[in-house]
Amino acid sequence: MPISHDVRQYSEEYDRLKLGIPTSSNFHKIITPHGKRSRQWREYACLLIAERILQRKIEFYRSPAMERGVIVEAEAADWYEFDQDVTVQPIGFITDDAHTVECSPDRLVGDDGLLEIKAPLPHTQVDYWLSGAVNERFWPQLQGQLYVSQRRWVDLLCWHDVLPKIVMRVEPDAAFIKALDRELQSFNFLYRACHGKDPRYQRGAGPPRTIGIEGGVPSEPGDCPVTANPIIARRHSPDPLSGEDRAGHF
């Protein structure tokens, strides 16, 4: 069941509660728009593991379009509310009940919808306007928002203060969401295993085994490319979250 967290986006509390959790805005690092495993899968998993161990958010470059999106979000949401004759509501973020995945839509729309706002550069806005279609690079994020929130649709608003504005509705894609669910299950298993949350990977749970890794990520959910290494698996340090000794920290 989806759980809404009513905190201000980008606040200190927002970052703390989201720490180390796969987020829909980064689902493209887990799954491609075509439903295949992303080549960024392992790198993203290691990033989240590092965040959990360090207990701080790891900052990255934010493009001008991303910065602009934050600045114009309120104005764009007001325009959408008037243009579509709907009521929108701010939201911090939404997680599943196990707190293993999350999404941060820009607004809730009524009881069934979401709003995601993009503020692209002018030439990109024109490209979206001419194509009249959702750019595939947004597909994992939008489908991920529907997967986590269990809402019926999400409106993608590509907003510019002068150029034509575009609103495109996206509904759940059953085949893609099935593939997304599969990849998220594997991804979260790796996270728990390598962070010492799965009892099979705790110290004393048996000797490490040698496994084959396809493309640098586990071939199956039970294959952890960190703890399966006999040298790495023998190293351990206290878990900063529980105070217990766990295998797999290095």
Which stretches of residues belong to each language-model region?
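Charged, glycine-rich intrinsically disordered N-terminal tails and low-complexity linkers that flank
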Residues: 1-71, 203-204, 209-240, 245-250
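Phenylalanine-focused residue identity feature
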Residues: 10, 27, 44, 60, ...
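A residue-identity detector for tryptophan
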Residues: 41, 79, 107, 129, ...
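Generic structural marker for isolated residues within well-ordered, non-membrane alpha-helices
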Residues: 46, 77, 142
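Acidic-basic catalytic patches of nuclease active cores, encompassing PD-(D/E)XK
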Residues: 66-88
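Nucleic-acid nuclease catalytic cores
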Residues: 84-105, 109-194
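Conserved catalytic or regulatory cores that recognize and/or transform ribose-phosphate-containing ligands
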Residues: 156-234, 249-250
